């Protein structure tokens, strides 16, 4: 599995295979697909922290398929478990119980905070969030929900309505019943205040939104502990505990969207919301849960799950799929053995120290933020004006690719670099990525 198929070559010429793939992409796939890089990179092979494109060029993957390949590409344990399960039973639906399904639910109950215990598996984070909305409404008897500005919840009608960025919303798909509060974006505080003297004014906005734009009773509030597509915006201490008090006061439940922050990604804890000492009634998860196999999950306290009995049938054709659950069980085992939250924390400290140094010596770095191996760099025209500079992000993207490093980007203004390597990344690989970033920022 670890044998290299090619040496590291970063001067890439677009070959015949690439041209054929991109031509078919244009002809047969929706044009709305977002492709990274001026010359898109069709991938052919992955191993550990590395991927190789169809032209034989090898890259260090520092974005992990959007925070999904938690334990690296093609980990032998996952490959073995998946192959064994595929030779035994590929599909069951939720109509028939099987060992992987219940074992994974039991495992998740053991690592999630508080009373979270009852799982319902689906196919994606979007589905998980939709199910969370339904569960919150069914449990509380209330209809309206809150989310945060700059948040992101996926491609469905409810997912796009929960999303707090106009670029990701589709007018014809917006549905009623959702309100958005100010997000805890300290770097660009709309109140022009600073933590802690601000006394968490952004958290107080949640109550103002409830009082002025809803009927005064809500089903809940869905929040990402660290906003993913929003640019890794990281709330200050105390923010979520204050928000939880407000939400529960008005009859709602807290929904933690851990699609990007879950499974040790933020270091020290299994789930991001734990850093703020909040125990949600509902939690959603996907992406890194199965290292690339399609899966979403909505886990609730027993009272929420029990309240839905008799409120309509639930079935999911691909939910709890035997192969995906086998992959997920193996993924969590690997995390426990090779990339525990404490191990991720240590790696995150190393990465953050290097990024802070880059930021101190660069005129274009406005802020470095995040936790663990979920780090963001907000790029600006200059530190004083804080003017977003998405065009500079594009320049950095192309330069890092030429150095054999694949990174991510995001943020409301498209000016945040997102760095999320596999949790199993080695120290040497971290050094390689840091070195490439240092070189690029010194040139930019």
Give the label of every model feature segment:
Residues 2-444:
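Conserved N-terminal phosphate-binding loop of PLP-dependent enzymes in the Aspartate aminotransferase
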